[in-house]
C-alpha cells in the first residue's frame, strides 16, 4: 500500500512511495544490511554513472543514519559501485542510489533488481 509505514527493524521504518515498489528486505536474520531495489529499469554506460530511484522513503530516529553500500556480487561480477551513500535521520525524500559502472560494457538493470544494501548505524 502506498504511504503505509512498515517497520523493518527496531530503528528502520520504510514507506512505499509508488504502487508496486519492492520494499527492502534482509537476506537473513544475521544480514548486516537490507537489500534495496530499483524502482524502474535503466542502464549505465561503461565508465558512467546513474542516479537510481528506489521508490521508498525511510524513517530513522535521531542518532541513527542509513549507509548505502555496494552489493559484493554486483561489484565483483560487473564492476558496479555505490557512491556517496549516507541517509540522515532528517531526510524524508525518496532514497536514491548513485551507481558507478567501472566495467567495460553497459550495465543494464530491471525494476525490482537489488542495487545496493542499506546498513543502519548509530552515529
Q: Where on the chain are the PLM-derived regions?
A:
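DUTPase catalytic domain/fold
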Residues: 1-123
Amino acid at each position: 500500500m502506498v504511504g503505509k509505514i512498515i517497520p523493518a527493524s527496531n530503528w528502520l521504518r520504510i514507506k512505499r512511495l509508488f504502487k508496486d515498489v519492492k520494499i527492502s528486505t534482509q537476506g537473513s536474520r544475521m544480514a548486516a544490511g537490507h537489500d534495496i531495489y530499483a524502482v524502474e529499469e535503466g542502464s549505465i554506460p561503461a565508465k558512467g554513472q546513474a542516479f537510481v530511484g528506489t521508490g521508498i522513503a525511510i524513517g530513522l530516529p535521531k542518532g541513527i543514519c542509513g549507509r548505502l553500500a555496494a552489493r559484493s556480487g554486483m561489484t565483483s561480477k560487473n564492476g558496479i559501485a555505490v557512491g556517496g551513500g549516507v541517509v540522515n535521520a532528517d531526510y524524508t525524500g525518496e532514497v536514491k542510489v548513485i551507481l558507478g559502472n567501472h566495467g567495460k560494457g553497459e550495465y543494464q538493470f530491471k525494476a525490482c533488481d537489488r542495487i545496493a544494501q542499506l546498513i543502519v548505524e548509530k552515529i
